[in-house]
Amino acid sequence: GDGRGILFGQIETPQGLRDLHIKGAGKTPYSRFADGRAVLRSTIREYLCGEAMHGLRIPSSRALLMFGSNELVFRETTETGAMLVRTAKTHIRFGHFEYLKHNDKREYIEELLDHVLAEYFPDLVDREDKYEIFFEKTVQSTAELIANWQAVGFAHGVMNTDNMSPVSYTHLRAHETQRYL
């Protein structure tokens, strides 16, 4: 992604563990050239679209809270800064696996995959074919998620590995919410 997100913990809910993730808090080691900030305008849009997905019964991250800041953020114009605290089953993305592969840290790929299986696919953990079945389930659930988007006229603006989760839920970034049809 653009390095604006910080995963800062998990909470126990009636639906199980949920990640707490803040977006727009500032620079992270992954911010690259960006400032790590979010602006109020796009944060409001992301909040509304994520809640719309939830209301339409399409798996989505949820906004726990959103707040503006006194800090000005420079984009095309000067804008009010903002932060969004999101919850989701996980913030693990396909991109995490991709990052490990491209940075020659392949020894961690199986460890991350085993973590995903233990947390979100425990019925597969002891199977010899666990990785193949996981792949099949992920392809199927991702296809169903995208079909649900299409059924309500949503077109995801950036279908890349940063925005796709192995547990198949809608992960929005503010600039992608403009593509609601």
Predicted regions and their residues:
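Conserved ATP-binding subdomain of kinase catalytic cores across diverse folds
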Residues: 1-123
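Phosphate/ATP-binding catalytic cores across multiple sugar-kinase/actin-like superfamilies
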Residues: 138-149
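Glycine-centered, phosphate/nucleic-acid-interacting loop/turn motifs that mediate DNA/RNA or nucleotide
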Residues: 153
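Catalytic-loop of the protein kinase fold
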Residues: 156
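Catalytic-loop Lys-Pro-X-Asn motif of eukaryotic-like protein kinases
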Residues: 161
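Conserved small/polar residues in nucleotide/adenosyl-binding loops
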Residues: 170-178
